[in-house]
Amino acid sequence: MNFRRLVLAITGLASLSLYGCTGAPGRPAPGAIPVDPDEVSDFTALYAQNCAGCHGPDGKGGAAISLSDSVYLSLADDAILRGAATKGIPKTAMPAFAKSEGGMLTDKQIDVIVRGIRERWSKPDVLRGVNPAPYRSPETGNPSRGSGVYSTYCSSCHGPQGRGGQKASSIVDGSYLALVSDQYLRTIVIVGRPELGAPDWRGNVPGKPMSPQDVSDVTAWLVSLRPKFPGQPYPPYPNDVKPTGEIR
């Protein structure tokens, strides 16, 4: 074997050895290597995995409030969105997502979600020249006045007692009221549920938008109807029977 053939043989063996290191059977392709969940930074992926189940794949149409509603996004600032995602909303189905609160997301990932919601769905000028009721009320509303506010602004759709009408369902159902927070009720009164045909505070009575006091009062009325113990009540024990705590 002359020198040239020796060089070619060595080069060939080296190439085969390199291929064996990089192209061995079973070695995953670069794109197939799983990404550390903490490193996911794409808004679409994070929203789909953590938000779409309740808020809808396009930010609307889910059981929870529409995040694609530009009126809502003009009312709720980034601190409100971040706080809800970080700590959840007590006594509701909205869980805490931040790792510091027992969730699965880093603070950076929550920032990505908040920023993505704002960039994708907000319309900064949607409330230009309009003065809606504030997101949070500095004062508690009056339930007695709220009953009258309901009759004026809400009964045409939800019925005279709030138990449902031809256009909308019950908003006084005990199970429903037990699943939502006071703030959720207030927010829905202000921004409506446009994806469900429910108008915001301006559209219930043409030419007569709800005042901030109207919003606070009807919210207080709804809150007053929430049962202390939601669900079907159990019958009380007979007077001559005392509970023993034993299961039989």
Where are these regions (language model features)?
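Bacterial N-terminal signal peptides that target proteins for export
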Residues: 1-10
